[in-house]
């Protein structure tokens, strides 16, 4: 990219950067996205938004990971209207899958994004149940 094109690009994007600085974005990621080979690109984009002053709330799914854990344990669950009916035995697999997925996401975000233009960026990662929807 030439200097002139870079300056033009920066001038075109700077109003959007200014408009969204300090705002909070809620991003939902499916469990499939976490397993995808492009997950590192998603992590990079999240780190970039955070470095531009956007606050990120990340909500992740884990259906694929839950299905895998249940299959490994030899357990089956029923669905009613696309909602899993989970008994006590299956709940252990659900907790393991969700915890593992969360750990994978948090570790990817807090690694400092090696081998990328965002190397050394400080991405703050905080996990917990801080917000409840009404």
Residue positions per predicted region:
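N-terminal glycine-/serine-/threonine-rich phosphate-binding loop
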Residues: 1-57
């Amino acid at each position: 990219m030439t200097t002139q094109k870079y300056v033009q690009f920066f001038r075109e994007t700077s109003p959007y950067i200014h408009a969204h600085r300090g705002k909070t974005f809620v991003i939902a990621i499916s469990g499939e996205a976490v397993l995808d080979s492009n997950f590192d690109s998603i992590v990079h984009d999240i780190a970039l938004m955070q470095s531009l002053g956007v606050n990120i709330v990340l909500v992740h799914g884990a259906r694929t990971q839950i299905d895998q854990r249940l299959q490994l344990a030899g357990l089956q669950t029923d669905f009613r209207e696309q909602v899993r009916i989970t008994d006590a035995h299956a709940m252990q697999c659900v907790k393991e899958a969700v915890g593992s997925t969360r750990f994978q996401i948090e570790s990817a975000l807090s690694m400092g994004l090696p081998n990328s233009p965002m190397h050394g960026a400080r991405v703050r990662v905080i996990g917990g149940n801080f917000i409840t929807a009404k």
